[in-house]
Amino acid sequence: MTKFWILILILVMATGCDTDQQEKENFPILTGKYLGQKDPGLTPEIFAPNIVSTGMTEINTCFSPDYSEFFYSIILPNRKFVIVSMKYENNRWNKPEVAEFSGQYSDADPFITKDGKWLYFVSKRPEDTTKTERRDWDIWRIGKVDGRWQNPEKLKNGINSESDDIYPTISEKGTLYFSSGRDGTNNRDIYYSESSGDEFNDPIKMNDTINGYWEGDIFISPKEDYMIFRSYGRKEGNGLFITFNNNDHWSTPKRMGNEINMTGNEFCPMVSPDGSYFFFTSSNIVMESENSELLTYKKIKEDFISSYEHPQMGKNDIYWVDSKIIDGYRENK
């Protein structure tokens, strides 16, 4: 009997290996810093269609400074979030896999520091792993030692609150920017915290030039000379806004143009480590040409199922565009 079960185990393992090998063989060979994708111009394009941007709900973008790893997030139908990674090994990008530190609890918003030593993210994981998932988001980080990510740790010193604290982004000098709903107004505001060694000082809320509506999903430039963030409730509309820092005075935020804000539901801004490309997430839908075909229930069901196999069907996809588009806003600030 024991030999029988050992044989079954060997067969199962062999089948699993065959499946993994088949998936690897079917996955396209992707090389270069940006997953082998053709560089975009000044018109946003879907990033890595049917590889990263699929019929699922993808958000966030995060490359390591040496372009050996790429991270993004997926929102599952049950509203659970998971961080996915791709690694550059043997001169090619591997297929997407759930990141080694994610998958058990809701995780999102990955950001890697310029030196590549820290990966920040948000999570609903409890500090006590015997407890259930938290209701609010907190900011965590994970260090890299000898090429391997270590155990996640929750940020301290007042960074996290009893409300959602999300979308960490860090400047070149180590200042942390993030969004929080801690003041209890049902809005989120942008806070920043200067670094003190490997820790952070108490966070400071940015003034009303920036805050006052609903602000979240911040990207701070390495030199802190501009900031892009998501906002709701402004008279200009919803979506992504940009502001510039002039001698420690932030300009009035301007809504980015319709080439970026295609639907008003654009978020998760990020600029690549080399500064070449601007990434963001959008729920833009590309409508097919209308026809007079008589719909049947079967056709409706087929189209609905098919919508989960293709990007640009309204479920959030990742876009990218040449970062020179940001300079255009700078000139008109």
Give a label for each model feature:
Residues 14-16:
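C-terminal motif of bacterial Sec signal peptides marking the signal peptidase cleavage site
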